[in-house]
Structures are given as C-alpha cells and as structure tokens.
A protein has these predicted regions:
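Phosphate-binding/switch loop-helix module in NTP-utilizing enzymes
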Residues: 99-161
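Conserved catalytic network of the ASCE P-loop NTPase/AAA+ motor domain
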Residues: 26-29, 54-58, 81-85, 121-125, ...
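Pre-Walker A adenine-sensing motif
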Residues: 16-27
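Scaffold/interface architecture of coatomer-like assemblies
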Residues: 25, 33, 40, 191, ...
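Conserved P-loop
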Residues: 33, 39-100
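Conserved P-loop NTPase
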Residues: 1-6, 11, 125-126, 194-199
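Phosphate-binding/switch region of NTP-binding enzymes
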Residues: 166-199
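Loop/turn-to-beta-strand initiation segments
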Residues: 61, 127-130, 161-170
Length: 199
C-alpha cells in the first residue's frame, strides 16, 4: 500500500496518468520497483505504456521488456489510444512467430537465468530511467517452481537497486489476495480491476 508524505510530491515522477498521479499523491517515488497487478484485460499494458510515454515526453530513455506480447501487439494497443511507440525501446523475449513461441520460451532452450541475464544486459546497455517488465506470469511459467521464481524476482530487485531507474513489474492477479511475497518486495502495489458499468 502506498503512503507518501505530501512534502515529497515534487520529487515524484508522473505515471503518465493524471488520475493515478492524484491517487498516489503526485506520482511514484523514483528509482524504486512497483507492481501493477490485475486480471487480463484490466489495463496493465495501457497504463504501462502511459508511464513510458511520459518518460519519452520528458526526454528520458525508457525500456519495455516483454516476455508476453510482441512489439506488433504493443503497437496495436498504442494505436488504439492514438499513441506511437517511437522513443520506447521494446525488448522482446518472445518470438514474433506464434508457432515458435512455445519453443522459444521452453525451459530446455532458454533457462530462466539466461532470460534474466538478457534483461540485465539490455538495461546495462541502454541505461533507461523507466522500465516495464511484462510479465511476471511468464516468468512464473519459466521458473517451474516457486523457489526458482522467487530467486529470479529477488535477482531483478537486487539488480535494479543498483540502477537509477523506476521499474514497474506487470503481473496477472492469481488470487484475491495476489502474490503476497511479490507485494513484500515491491515499493508499492497498484491493483487494477475491470468494472462492469450499468447502463
């Protein structure tokens, strides 16, 4: 849960969503790791793109690491909102060919630690100030065990504490309470829900 003292507002960075910035008391504390959690279709990708586009608008380097969606799929989401991905470095760890997707991410061919190392290498090369990691659900599948998954998430956290960048991890909400271990290592958790509107 996010509880920010109000005098720190000037130091916070915008999420790219005025409404969310207002809820968060001005935005996010910089150089921290956050979790955006919600069911599929709740808007995680959209709100993640808003965060990066705000960075682009401010002249920052930004990185979208994707294990779940191709660049073409992200471009389609952006296009629906009238946005462009220009200025966003999209690092795909998913095959653009759906026929190959399962083999590309199969643990026998691409170990989880190798995937994590590729992310570290890309961040070190590009030195972004804003990073989206999409998504932890795929990392869970790659890990094949809760212990391996937790180790890799902790490795991500330890790596990013040495960088000057704000990181948002995207995750599907797997239960009503969410992933409590993941909540405990995140600086803040934003829960996204789909609401049915009565007409």
């Amino acid at each position: 849960d996010l509880d920010f003292p109000m005098d720190d507002e000037a130091q916070r960075i915008s999420t790219g969503s005025e409404g969310l910035d207002n809820i968060l008391g001005g935005g996010l504390d910089p150089n921290r790791m956050y979790l955006y959690e919600g069911s599929p279709g709740s808007g995680k990708t959209t709100i993640a793109l808003q965060f990066l586009l705000e960075g682009v608008r401010r002249g920052e380097r930004v990185l979208y690491v994707t294990l779940s969606e191709t660049k073409a799929e992200l471009e389609l989401v952006a296009k629906r909102h009238g946005w462009s991905l220009d200025g966003i470095d999209v690092f795909e760890l998913v095959s653009p060919d759906p026929e190959l997707e399962l083999t590309v991410l199969h643990p026998a061919e691409m170990e989880l630690s190798e995937t994590t190392q590729q992310v570290f290498d890309r961040v070190s090369e590009t030195n972004p100030t804003r990073v989206i990691f999409d998504s932890l659900s795929e990392m869970r599948l790659l890990a094949q065990s809760p212990l391996r998954y937790r180790r890799q998430v902790l490795a991500l956290k330890h790596f990013f504490t040495t960088r000057r960048c704000t990181v948002i991890l995207l995750d599907d909400q797997t239960s009503e309470m969410g992933d409590l271990q993941l909540h405990s290592i995140s600086h803040g958790v934003v829960l996204l829900e789909q609401l049915a509107i009565d007409y």
